[in-house]
Amino acid sequence: MSSREKEQTIALSAIFQAAELVSILAKTGQVDNASLQPLLESLLMVNAASTEDIYGGQWDYSTNLALGRKISRQALGKERSSVNPDTLRYALSLIHLENKLSKTPEMLSTIGQKIAQIEQKKAHYESVLHENMVASISGMYQDTLSKLSFRIQVHGDSRFLQQPQVANQVRAILMSGIRAAMLWRQLGGKRWHLIFKRKALLSALESRN
């Protein structure tokens, strides 16, 4: 097990956490803020000293990404059938969409500018979970990633998905998932690793218990 694989599991856990939260939110209209906050915070961590710092630091990242680590272990291990199919689809779609984004430098530049603007807004609100912060992150997704040819189709209860607050949360979570997918790629992660490097990734995930 390499240190690179250990770092990759952090990004992978964040991807699966985002995917699972979207799946839950789309069906119930509710989301666990303890799992949501570190994902949204990660969008503003543009100069983090380490991968761990992006999700809360050495002592907190493991707890912050506990849901994602659980889903990652299930998805890569023998419990794959227990993972919500929508969660798996969202996770793979996030990786695919980020790959398309990486080939669009102008859009990347726009996202960077918008993140800087959102970071300034945070000073006016108590938390990144404030509805205005979530709406700003959602708007960033709409103005950029929603314009690519590949779009993530979210399935759930229309009663919830038609609510502006829920729709904003969904897009904000997807944006955080793109952040995680970008980190995954920067750390050398590839989609085929989820098939052919499953044992190594599982070992790294288990080592973080």
From Swiss-Prot:
Signal peptide: none annotated. Its main location: cytoplasm. Keywords: Cell inner membrane, Cell membrane, Cytoplasm, Membrane. It is found in: Cytoplasm; Cell inner membrane. It is a peripheral membrane protein. InterPro entries: HflD, HflD-like_sf. It comes from the Bacteria. GO terms for cellular component: cytoplasm; plasma membrane. Belongs to the HflD family. This is High frequency lysogenization protein HflD homolog.
